[in-house]
């Protein structure tokens, strides 16, 4: 029972009415709001509760349980699928998903991150991208939806993914692009643009993000005369720019 107002079993969290659901939400921690809805944290269950914007606008969402949970059987360590639906009087108003104690990549200072850990995380994520590709899942809008913590990457907001034949490279490209932007944009643009190989690799759709990370790290290490593990070890090469492409959560 959730505040004695809902039933919670299997794939459904069901509330009696809007008043009871709003009371339940008031007991959760607000996480953030996006184009699709608002997220809350249930610390008790270690769950993210995502409520569609349609609920707050008093409109029907139009989603079915089958659609929301369509990828939940693809077991992996990277993609955070919806695992339960939320209903009020048999109307779906949102879903739940496992909570991961991680930060959005765009809110992390790139200078402080361990490059070995980041590379390991990207390699593991690649395996899961291959897995979902083999299951005919087409990724969509992954940029700004990648979380990171201690050598692990997670990808959230998978609602707009589709069942469609797609190449592994096309699916991986979304992670590749954000990885490159995270490492370079508004910090090392001049360094990259002044190096022929890095300039050719940077943000090219056919370039693997992990390969760019390795090459970028090697080039920085050569310049500063030692093998760097964090970008702040090459801070002498930073030229901050206000003309950025990657929207970071700080500047």
PLM features: what roles do these ranges have?
Residues 47, 78, 95, 154-157:
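Protein kinase-like catalytic core scaffold
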Residues 150-251:
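C-lobe/activation-segment region of protein kinase-like
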Residues 59-68, 119-123, 172-178:
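Well-ordered, non-membrane alpha-helical segments in soluble/globular domains
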Residues 76-122:
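Conserved structural core of kinase catalytic domains
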Residues 5-6, 18, 26-29, 36, ...:
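Catalytic phosphate/metal-binding cores of nucleic-acid and nucleotide-processing enzymes, i.e., regions
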Residues 24-85, 109-111:
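ATP-binding glycine-rich loop module of kinase domains
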Residues 2-29, 59-63:
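Juxta-kinase regulatory segment immediately upstream of eukaryotic protein kinase catalytic domains
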Residues 108-148, 153:
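Conserved kinase catalytic-core helix
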